[in-house]
Amino acid sequence: MLQDQLREIRTQLRMAMNGITSTSMREKGIIYKLNFGVPLPEIKQIAATHEPGSELAAALWKEDIREFKILASMLQPADDFPFDQAKQWVKEIPYLEIAEQCSRNLFCKLPYVDNLLLGLIFNVEDEYARTVAYLIWAELFKEGKTVVAPVRAAFIVECMRSIAWPDFGATWKEKQAAVKAMKFYGRQSADHARQMLSGFDEFPEFMETPEGQEIYNDLKFEFEYYS
C-alpha cells in the first residue's frame, strides 16, 4: 500500500515536472538527489489526491527529493507528530524553501507550538532552527493568533538579537525571517508596532548603519501602511 502510494506520487510528479525550474534551482546551489521542478500550486494539487498519514509523510520526508519533502509537510497530520520528531525534521531541513513549507503547512499547527518555538529560538546549533522559529511566528501572527507571554517576550528580544547584534552572527535568511515575523506582529495593533520599533532605540550604533536604517524604515512603512 505505502509503496503503491509512493509510486503514484512519483508518476504524478513526473507528469508535472519542469526541467527549466529544476535546472535553475541547481544552478543556484539547491541540489537534491532528485528535483522535478514542480511549482507549489501543483504540489498542493497532488497532495489533495492523497490521504494524510504519518507513515506516508515519514516515507516521503526521508527521501532526498524536493517535492517529497514538501508533500511530507502537507500530508503529516499535526495531531500525530511527536515533539522529538518535529525537532528532528528541523535538524534535517536542507534549504530555506523546505523550512518555509514545513513552518506554513505543519509546524505552526502543532498543539505544542509554544514549546517548540522556545526550543528553536534558543537553538544555535542547527542551521535552520532560529529561522524556522521566526517563520512559525510569522504564520501565527499573520493569522492574528497570539502566543503565551514567555514566548512573546522571547520573540521580541531575539528579533533584535538576530537583526542588530553585530557579534551574534545571524545568517541572512535568519534576519529576513525575523523581519517578516516582526512585520506581521506589528500589523496586529499600534501597541505591537511601537514595541517593534522601540526595540531599535537600544541599538544606536546599528541604527547608524545602512542596514539598520533600511530595516527600521521598512518596518515603519509597513506599520503605517496597515495602521
Please annotate each region the language model reported.
Residues 1-227:
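Alpha-helical scaffold domains
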